[in-house]
Amino acid sequence: LSDHLTLLATDGSKRVRLMQAARAQLRLPPAQVLEWRDWLRQPSLLDAALAQPGMFKIEPPGDDTAAHLHLLHDGCRLLGRPPVRDPEHGELLLMDTWFAGFAAAMEGLASQLNTLPQTRLVNAPAEIVAMTDKLACQQHLAAHGVPVPTLLGPVHGYEHLQTLLSEHQLDRVYLKPRYGSSASGVVAYRRNRAGRQQATSSASLQRVDGEPRLFNLKRISRYESESEIATLVDILAKQQLYAETWLAKPRMGDSHYDLRVVTIGGQPAHRVARIGAQMMTNLHLDNQRGDATSLLGPADMAALETTATLAASAFPHSTLAGYDLVVRHGQAHVLEANAFGDLLPGLMWQGQDTYTAQLRHHHEQ
């Protein structure tokens, strides 16, 4: 197998540990790790790291607070915004500003990589950015014929949400931060004719020194008062929020599920059902894994594979991606694409985890 792999990552993170374990299993030398924070401070470190031919994989900054703050402060500068206080741990703050810094960093990285033709990329920076902008990503998938939930466009605040619902004659929608990840800030909103409403989210609304703030928690919160829901939506809308139609997920007993499929080299590989009683079925929210093969009949499995393949073809310069799908009645819709969707410890496909499978794929190429 190809010997040399460099990761732009956070050393010691779960992603790095799983990749190093896969390399050890295949009797490959450990991957070289370039820390995000170091590269952001001194981009020339990348040129040195990639001096010899090999593979290069971009992982997310993860738990590297210094890297996230660097991106946030770069975003402020690029958008002409005044310097901001540092977000507290888990706080949903200035996601759009962070994204501006992240997109600029990826653009700079792409320029650097253009001078290093001997380096083979796992995922191209431009496509990582495209998948991180959730609204643009869904529009991109739809333009390539991939079925997605109907997009209702940006939401500018609570009052605008009410207008949108009335215009489209809807009483329930999903609200998603344009630059969020892992269900952070996603809101399942519904109202009825009697005027009652409910918002369900992993975003926890807290008051700090009298100021409302949002924190991403690994548990679901429910809001039923108009003032709390309006505050929740308004805070998220300031960071760019969009709405999409509510797609019912198939049920299994008292729970419902969607599916994560990892594509490698454009082909569907690892797949897992994400089963939960709550609206959000993300696995990090204490939901359960389920066996996709036992849950899906032949027509649904065919729809899953066809749709995942079509979605992957919309990102031809991404060897690897995770897609979240709702599959029912022989139809599949893509809820989200994730350029970093391979963090599924222990999930096997044809006897290999996601990290071993991607290393083998690169060797075969």
Identify the role of each PLM range:
Residues S2-T6:
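Extreme N-terminal starter segment of soluble prokaryotic enzymes
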Residues A9-G12, D38, V155, Y179, ...:
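Short, flexible loop/turn elements at secondary-structure junctions
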Residues T10-V155, E159-T163:
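Conserved N-proximal alpha/beta basic substrate-recognition cap immediately N-terminal to
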Residues R23, L241, S318-L320:
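PAS/PAS-like sensory domains
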Residues R120, V173, A269-H270, H333-E336:
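Protein kinase-like catalytic core scaffold
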Residues L165-N282:
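Phosphate-binding site of ATP-dependent enzymes
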Residues R260, G322-D324:
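Short, surface-exposed charged micro-motifs
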Residues I275, N282-L320, V327-Q365:
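C-terminal active-site "lid" helix and adjoining low-complexity regulatory extension at the edge
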